[in-house]
A protein has these predicted regions:
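Carbohydrate-interacting regions of secretory-pathway proteins
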Residues: 1-187
Length: 187
């Protein structure tokens, strides 16, 4: 269990807000390779914000690849006026790579879930990449990515060494997204 509302021992600079929820902008102390995790999140109600400004955050797997968190409930063509990443930027999208198969967002202030299965990239003894990382994501119980093969780079970021394990990072994007019931099982 990484977070059950009682303490932030598993997190770097983790903070509990409203007496029971984990605040955005923290990462796990432990680093992970192959794993499965579950988390619940809640986006704020921001009725005057447009597009990606509505409850924007993200969950970074291995501190590299971002699973988008945003209030995309009711997302429609109107949102494309405000965002260049309007497809990828929906909740559950893999940032700048692929949008979710279906928009499974609940309204803001509702608790939502991500259940994620992640398989790290594989390398031979010489350090040559043999197989890319792969991810499966369920948003609110519905599969939105099925064994998606992740490219060898993280869009918009400096090159990374995929051989390293990494933390789970809950992005600080200056929006008050909160989390609860976070657990992870290494595989």
């Amino acid at each position: 269990m990484l977070f059950d509302g009682t303490d932030t021992d598993a997190w770097v600079d983790g903070k509990i807000v409203e007496n029971k929820w984990l605040r955005w902008g923290t990462r796990t102390k432990q680093h992970f390779g192959d794993h499965m995790f579950h988390l619940e999140y809640r986006t704020p109600y921001m009725p005057t914000a447009k597009g990606m400004q509505r409850g924007n955050s993200g969950v970074y797997v291995q501190n590299i690849w971002e699973i988008q968190i945003v209030d995309s409930f009711g997302w429609n063509e109107e949102n494309r006026k405000y965002e260049r990443l309007s497809i990828f930027g929906q909740a559950g999208g893999l940032h700048e790579m692929i949008g979710p198969r279906i928009n499974m967002s609940f309204p803001p202030l509702s608790w939502q879930t991500f259940d994620v299965e992640f398989v790290s990239a594989r390398f031979d003894e010489m350090g040559n990449k043999m197989k890319s990382a792969m991810i499966t994501v369920y948003h609110n119980g519905i599969m939105i990515h099925d064994r998606y093969v992740i490219p060898s780079f993280a869009p918009g970021r400096d090159p990374v060494d995929e051989r390293d394990k990494g933390p789970l990072y809950l992005q600080d994007h200056k929006n008050p997204v909160v989390y609860r019931n976070i657990w992870l099982v290494e595989r």
